[in-house]
Each structure stands twice: as structure tokens, then as C-alpha cells.
Curated annotation (Swiss-Prot):
Gene name of the record: tsf
The protein's role, per its UniProt record: Associates with the EF-Tu.GDP complex and induces the exchange of GDP to GTP. It remains bound to the aminoacyl-tRNA.EF-Tu.GTP complex up to the GTP hydrolysis stage on the ribosome.
Protein name: Elongation factor Ts
Lineage, uppermost ranks: Bacteria, Pseudomonadati, Pseudomonadota, Alphaproteobacteria, Hyphomicrobiales
Species name: Parvibaculum lavamentivorans (strain DS-1 / DSM 13023 / NCIMB 13966)
Subcellular location: Cytoplasm
Span list, region Involved in Mg(2+) ion dislocation from EF-Tu: 80-83
Length: 308
């Protein structure tokens, strides 16, 4: 059995909000498996469901660019927020987003492509900027959405300058209707996505393994109630529907009008747009998503510096 360390207990406690002893018990019961420990706590009603476990800590900017029927989004990381406020860095992220659009969001093609207005590749330009600014930085990821007939809308949350911020969203809408009205609807949906962080556009696109894991947790949790199997089955199905309402875009309550789901809001907008509308998909990048920043002991650093 894996050794249960204090840092493991601390990480689980920070992720779930459960008590220290409960976290230790969960890790002991699951042989130190962090994901299984989260599920164990949930079956005991000691932790809330988490769409994504893990701490988020990275600096830099999300860059978004859209030209009507296509849009690209990139994440460029830096070591400090100070650099993210640097105009040179901001221009670089904007340029890289534009370059990403030209290669349809393909990451490998992006870093190898020619940096706008330069003979260098994007990767070489970033490397040069590391020397100029004096801080490590990197292009972390890129994506693109396009539609054949319709609109791609963009939204940036916590925007520092146009097209750059901490959260970026692109959403693609297929429709032969009024493009101006379609873009406005798309922007509202993009704002909704920034706020709610859905996992999929429609439930058929959900990761089956994730749904199965959720179902297993709900079954185990329901069995703790001691109720008959037929009642448990109904309880689980009801909670799975609730799960979809929380994480599937079209099933979510629309933040702009919570009385409607996003799907109903899109359907209602068709009359104004003048044609049927299909939500093709979306991309949502949050700065530092899934990155754990190395923690430093400031007191130890000062002591080490004092010792020379």
C-alpha cells in the first residue's frame, strides 16, 4: 500500500473541502489513489463533485481572435503577472493568436509557423523574447473553431486589452440568418460559457468514462441510504439528469435568463435571426488551467540568500 503523506492529505483537503481525518481515511481506503479518494469522500457525502480537480496557478494571457466565420484562441504563459502586463508580451500574444488562426489552431504548425512581421518561427520569436524580457515564457496550447455559414463569436473575461485576458471563449453558430444578430447571440452564449465552464455542447458528446464514473459514485452514494434497488435506480437517473444540467451547455440554465436553458434560448432566437441555428461547438481556455505552480518557501529563500 502506498504511504499516505501529509502533503497528500493536504492536497485532498484543498480539492474537496473535507476534514483532515476524513481525507486521511479516504486515502487509506483507496491505497493513496487521489481520484478514487475524491470519489470515496463523495459517496460518504463528505465532498462535493468537482468538474476538474487540481489547483490552478500560472501567469500569462489568453489571446482570442475572430474574423466572422472562424476564430482562434491561445494560451501563452509567463512566470509573473508583471510580465503579462508588459506591452511587448501583450503584442506577442495577440500576434500568436492571429498566427493560430492562419493554421486553424494546429499547435505544432503554430510554433513552427513564421511569426507575423518576422522571418523567425513563433517558437524562435518566443525564445528571443525570453532573453529580451528576462523571464521564461511559452506557448502552451491553441485551438480554432470555424463554420461554413454562420458566425464565430468571441468573449474575453477579465480583459486587460482587447482580445487578451484571463479567460477566453469561442463559440460557433451555424445559420443562414442575420449575421449581426447571430454574433450578438453568440457573444451572450460565450459569456455564459465563461461563467459556467460546461464540459460538452450536448450530452451525446460527453466523455462516456466521465459519465460512468459519475454514475458509479451516485450509485454508491444512493446505496448508503439503504433504500430498495428500484428506488435507488430512480434516484440515480434523476441525479444523472441533474449532472447533465450542470455540465452540458445546451442543458444548462442560461445565465442571461435562468428561466430558459441555453437550448431554449437558441431556439427562441431563431425568429429574430430569421433561420434555424445550430451550436456547432465551443472552446474555453482559462489561464493556468490544470497547471500547478511550484510553491516556494519565502523564509527559506531569504535564509539561503543571507548565508550566501
Amino acid at each position: 500500500m502506498a504511504e499516505i503523506t501529509a502533503s497528500m492529505v493536504k492536497q485532498l483537503r484543498e480539492t474537496t473541502g473535507a476534514g483532515m481525518m476524513d481525507c486521511k481515511s479516504a486515502l487509506t481506503e483507496t491505497g493513496g489513489d487521489m481520484e478514487a479518494a475524491i470519489d470515496w469522500l463523495r459517496t460518504k457525502g463528505l465532498a462535493k463533485a468537482a468538474k476538474k480537480a487540481g489547483r490552478v496557478a500560472a501567469e500569462g494571457l489568453i489571446g482570442v481572435v475572430a474574423n466572422g466565420t472562424a476564430g482562434a484562441i491561445v494560451e501563452v504563459n509567463s512566470e509573473t503577472d508583471f510580465v503579462a502586463r508588459n506591452e511587448q508580451f501583450q503584442k506577442m500574444v495577440s500576434d500568436i493568436a492571429s498566427a493560430a488562426l492562419s493554421v486553424e489552431g494546429d499547435f505544432d504548425k503554430l510554433v513552427a509557423s513564421t511569426y507575423p512581421g518576422s522571418s523567425k518561427s513563433v517558437q524562435d520569436y518566443v525564445t528571443e523574447m525570453v532573453g529580451t524580457i528576462g523571464e521564461n515564457m511559452s506557448v502552451r496550447r491553441a485551438g480554432c473553431i470555424s463554420v461554413s455559414d454562420g458566425a464565430v463569436a468571441a468573449y474575453v473575461h477579465s480583459q486587460v486589452v482587447p482580445g487578451l485576458g484571463k479567460i477566453g471563449v469561442l463559440v460557433g453558430l451555424e445559420s443562414k440568418g442575420d449575421k449581426t444578430k447571430l454574433l450578438e447571440l453568440g457573444r451572450q452564449i460565450a459569456m455564459h460559457i465563461a461563467a459556467t465552464n460546461p464540459l460538452a455542447t450536448r450530452k451525446e458528446e460527453m466523455d462516456p468514462a466521465l459519465v460512468e464514473r459519475e454514475r458509479n459514485v451516485l450509485i454508491a452514494e444512493a446505496k448508503e441510504s439503504g433504500r430498495p434497488d428500484n428506488i435507488i435506480e430512480k434516484m440515480v437517473e434523476g441525479r444523472i439528469r441533474k449532472f447533465y444540467e450542470e455540465v452540458v451547455l445546451l442543458s444548462q440554465a442560461f445565465v442571461i435568463n435562468p428561466d430558459d436553458t441555453v437550448e431554449k434560448a437558441v431556439k427562441a432566437a431563431e425568429a429574430d435571426v430569421g433561420a434555424p441555428i445550430t451550436v456547432v461547438g465551443f472552446l474555453r481556455f482559462a489561464l493556468g488551467e490544470g497547471i500547478e505552480k511550484e510553491e516556494s518557501d519565502f523564509a527559506a529563500e531569504v535564509a539561503a540568500a543571507a548565508r550566501g
